[in-house]
Amino acid sequence: TKAQLARWVDYANQKGAVIIYDAAYEAYISQEDVPHSIYECEGARTCAIELRSFSKNAGFTGLRLGYTVVPKDLKVNDVSLHSLWARRHGTKYNGAPYIVQRAGEAVYSAKGEAQLKQQIAYYMKNAACILQGLRDAGYRVSGGVNAPYIWLETPKGMGSWQFFDELLENAGVAGTPGAGFGPNGEGYFRLTAFGSYE
């Protein structure tokens, strides 16, 4: 929620820490109390960098188009991170290919925005269906509300890779074993709503 995120912003400002905030799924947010940007929180411009991607909202996975917001107010030890980022980026990065830039431009056209809203609504309908189906089948689940991913606890203490094999072999369903996200992901499994409703 915005209140929870605001507490992190306050903490970062008190400790002199920098938050790197991944807003890749911003377009999927539907709940009013969940911010679309960390900069909706007072004080975030002095402690946060926000990452934005076209991969999740516009299906640009593999094309690598996104942007980073580094506020001019963000300083560490009195050094502007905005200036350092601009210098680094201007020296090391030559920009996205022209055709990818044009595709990114199309995302912000009236037609592009309408198509993306329609596509996101479709994926979220899928997420709601998967979420309810898993609940009805007795699984402990979460997610599928402000992002197109549904997490479930693997049954009977089964390892996430073992559950992956079982689902693939017996149901023809592929997903992502939680162990792939690190040791705390073990015992969980992630399904995606990026598919056809049927």
Regions found by a protein language model. Name each.
Residues 1-198:
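PLP-dependent class I/II
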